[in-house]
């Protein structure tokens, strides 16, 4: 899947959870959605894209930071 599409998707998810929530709560909810709903391949690609992608909004960026922190060890082991 193209990086731009994944970035757009995670931004949309973050926007949804960010409406009416604190940024940290919204980032956690975004992360949980991604872990529940995205295929392993999509999560691995998002980890490779990383939180430095300039297209990420603040909540999405934090969610990707959390994703990298939680998914990176399984990437190495798998």
Language-model region placement:
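Intrinsically disordered, low-complexity, basic-enriched segments
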Residues: 1-32, 36-78
């Amino acid at each position: 899947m193209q990086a731009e599409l994944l970035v757009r998707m995670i931004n949309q998810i973050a926007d949804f959870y960010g409406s009416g929530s604190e940024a940290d709560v919204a980032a956690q909810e975004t992360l949980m959605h991604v872990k529940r709903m995205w295929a392993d391949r999509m999560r691995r690609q998002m980890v490779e894209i990383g939180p430095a992608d300039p297209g990420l909004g603040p909540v999405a960026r934090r969610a990707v930071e959390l994703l990298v922190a939680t998914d990176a060890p399984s990437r190495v082991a798998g």
